[in-house]
């Protein structure tokens, strides 16, 4: 049965320790009615404090689900790759202390910085080698590792699918962000259909859209890979076909968590309950 989740990232500046802070966000997520919560890197995501996240989740009665971290495995130098793999493994240790069952790590920040052979296929062997070693290590700690469709370079459905198959490890799958395919100018529901068999975790996100031929709309908008304009929206408020994508995942047999990752400009204390209500409605379609 699919359960609801929210990313600490969705709380924006409220997750700062001068505001609600990480532990306060955990309480607020539970008050809003989410089944689970996931985390981005913060002041508590280290070996000294990670256990406090687990303890707070147990105290309020919400499940710690996932930990999202940065990473760059597109490194040709073997020593550099080895160093980055070691660093990400150390974050797997942190994830274990947090009590989460999944870890999403970035795989690349872009193509090789040279004038030839710079494409995704050139970087893929290095990324796959590193991701495979991390997946193997995390399996021993009971943590599933994932790649997410974000960051432009590894964002298209076919690229992400190619990466997962290149890694070829049972402990490595996809965090499918249903809105992020728009950043690569793809049709979200079609791309979700490609990625559904690999889904280990899901981010629910939506965007407003303006064609790149128009004038820049202003603050809060950013460019897709081909120059269209996007702005974060509540689930169902944008044009990202959120309901259809959720239905595709539901019909595929996915039964994990669906996590709200809100990037809009509205007040989060209003936006997140609204997003949760829409997610629950869409799951019933």
What are these regions (language model features)?
Residues 6, 29, 37, 57, ...:
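Conserved, mostly hydrophobic/aromatic
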Residues 13-18, 39-50, 72-82, 111-115, ...:
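Acidic-and-aromatic substrate-binding clefts and catalytic sites of carbohydrate-active enzymes
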Residues 36-37, 67, 132-239, 281:
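Acidic/histidine-rich catalytic cores of soluble enzymes
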Residues 21-42, 98-99:
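Catalytic domains of carbohydrate-active enzymes, especially glycoside hydrolases
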Residues 269-285:
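C-terminal helical cap(s) of enzyme catalytic domains, especially alpha/beta-barrels
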Residues 1-19:
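Boundary/entry segment of secreted carbohydrate-active catalytic domains
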Residues 55-63, 78-174, 183, 243:
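Active-site acidic/histidine proton-transfer and metal-coordination neighborhood
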Residues 15-29, 82-93, 184-192, 242-245:
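Short, acidic/polar
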């Amino acid at each position: 049965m699919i359960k609801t989740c929210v990313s600490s990232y969705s709380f924006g500046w409220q997750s700062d320790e001068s505001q609600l802070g990480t532990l306060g966000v955990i309480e607020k997520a539970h008050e809003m009615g989410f089944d689970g919560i996931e985390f981005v890197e913060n002041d508590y995501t280290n070996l000294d404090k990670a256990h406090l996240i687990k303890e707070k989740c147990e105290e309020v009665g919400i499940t710690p689900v996932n930990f999202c971290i940065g990473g760059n495995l597109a490194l040709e130098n073997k020593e550099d790759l080895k160093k980055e793999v070691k660093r990400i493994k150390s974050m797997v240790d942190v994830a274990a202390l947090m009590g989460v069952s999944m870890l999403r790590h970035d795989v690349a920040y872009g193509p090789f910085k040279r004038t030839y052979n710079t494409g995704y296929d050139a970087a893929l062997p290095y990324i796959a080698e590193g991701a495979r070693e991390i997946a193997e290590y995390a399996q021993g700690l009971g943590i599933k590792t994932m790649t997410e469709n974000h960051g432009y370079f590894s964002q298209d459905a076919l690229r992400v699918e190619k990466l997962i198959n290149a890694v070829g490890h049972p402990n490595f799958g996809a965090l499918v962000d249903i809105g992020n395919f728009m950043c690569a100018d793809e049709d979200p529901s079609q791309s979700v259909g490609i990625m559904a068999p690999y889904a280990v975790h899901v981010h629910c996100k939506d965007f407003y859209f303006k064609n790149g031929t128009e004038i820049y709309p202003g603050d809060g908008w950013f460019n897709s890979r081909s120059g269209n304009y996007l702005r974060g929206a509540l689930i169902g408020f944008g044009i990202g076909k959120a309901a259809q994508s959720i239905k595709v995942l539901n019909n595929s047999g996915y039964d994990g968590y669906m996590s709200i990752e809100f990037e809009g400009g509205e007040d989060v204390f209003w936006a997140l309950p609204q997003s949760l209500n829409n997610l629950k409605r869409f799951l019933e379609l």
